[in-house]
A protein has these predicted regions:
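Active-site neighborhoods and metal-handling regions in enzymes and metal-associated proteins
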Residues: 1-172
């Protein structure tokens, strides 16, 4: 379905460089897919600590990402615009990062103005089907906007009505 991404440089989206050596304290990202004989694709990503346990900072970031995921899942229901779920996940992230001293100010303002996108440069998910990013532009052009213009703001521009749900963020 796509070349496996296996890297200690998860801060670079779709990083296929494999020349690094994993060392103590690193986080290891694997983003892998599979394709069935029928042609349908799957996509799975996970980040694990090289030392098998998170450092305290890594644990704090993991807990923020997990809260983003859980709050997003709770918010999903028929009729809710996917952008609202994205905004919710971004606000959860901003509040968590404020607790770590990495962001400040009002979370709603930060999300509205795009300050969160420094840590959340991607959308919330993507369509999957016969391609791992099936009909990539469908959600942006045809689904869920009701005539509203598509945002060009980093992170927001790739919102789609889609599964899987993949909240997360990047910290370099």
């Amino acid at each position: 379905s796509f070349p496996t991404i296996a890297t200690i440089n998860g801060q670079t989206l779709h990083n296929h460089y494999h020349g690094n050596k994993i060392k103590s304290g690193d986080l290891f990202l694997i983003d892998a897919g599979a394709e069935l004989p029928s042609g349908y694709c799957g996509d799975m990503s996970s980040t694990v600590p090289a030392d098998k346990t998170f450092t305290s900072k890594q644990r704090a970031v993991y807990e923020i990402q997990n809260a983003m995921h859980l709050e997003s899942v709770k918010a999903l229901r028929p009729g809710i615009p996917y952008m609202e779920v994205y905004d919710l996940s971004a606000r959860v992230m901003v509040e968590g990062l404020k607790g770590l001293g990495l962001m400040k100010g009002n979370a709603d303002d930060a999300v509205r103005e795009g300050a969160h996108a420094l840590f959340y440069p991607h959308g919330l998910g993507h369509m999957m089907g016969l391609d791992v990013h099936d009909m990539e532009n469908l959600g942006e052009v045809w689904v869920g906007y009701n005539g509203q213009p598509k945002s060009t703001q980093f992170g927001r521009k790739s919102q789609r009505l889609a599964i899987p749900l993949e909240p997360g963020f990047v910290h370099t």
